[in-house]
Amino acid sequence: MFFARLASGPIHNINSFQKQLVNLPIKLTEENITVGIQRILLGSIKKFVVAERLAVDVNQYFDHPFDILSSCDVLFACIFYTVELYFDFSGYIDIAVGSAKLFGIQLSENFNMPLRAKSISEWWRRWHITLINWFTQYIYYPIAYRFKSKRNLAIVFSIGGTFLVSAVWHGLGLTYLFWGLIHVFYLIVEAFSKKNLAAIEQKLKPRLYAALFIPITILLVSFSNIFFRASSMTDAFGIIHKLFDWNHFWPPLSFKDWLIHGEGGSLKDLFNFRLAAFVAILYLIYEEKCLKIVNDVKYSIFRIVFMLLILIILGVFDSAGNFIYMEF
């Protein structure tokens, strides 16, 4: 097994991947080394500057006694867990892709800016792309073909079968099964609402449509991730109960105090969270440009030094955990 390509992805067809390995040994080139190092540093910043800092607050909220949390606390925890998961997993992929690039081996991209998705189906076309392609080829299409004469049944069973396997892929617990069932529900509703959604998209300007449906998609994914993150069904339903407890929506502080001082926690934790949130939002705004820059050789020495300084100064290494998707 090539060391940069682990079970968490990117997942390749053996025939296409083997063609690259046939040409070994690889000649090291300035471009491959430069782009590879930049990609590794980008992935390390995602993991150790953003994901690890977000994890401190996210873990605190998910592992906190739910009866003292407000709905706003739970809402932010769910959203930022989704952000943490993305930066953690895409950071791992960046490191894997960059490590392979050092030796001239091209691994497939596994993400295409999923937090810009305007629907759940688009989310899954942008998230863990190599795994979804594998599921589509070997599970979705065969089931859909089996029911090709009955379109509605084909949609229901192909989506249901795909996400049943996906749930088992991640774990055998009920929480993963419910996570999969929620996405089955999302995708079936979307599939049967295509005409209505297309009509809405035609009436709205593209930017307005994106401004409306990107947040909706993130909220829907974040809700499903309650089951993905919770350690038990009891915890998951406890979080959901607090999420919809409208009598305690805001924290027991004024919004200004809550925004500045937070609710409990040390000053170090509050700084970690705000710094991580700022870097995450900044990156997501300029994500497309950042990905182009790290694949550019021009002025690379300045970018490498800059990213290395960010990693050394702001990285969290002493309490860093494993990459989340290494657990699956």
Describe the role of every protein-language-model region.
Residues 1-281, 290-327:
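Membrane-embedded transmembrane alpha-helical bundles that form the catalytic cores
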Residues 286:
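Substrate/cofactor-recognition hotspot
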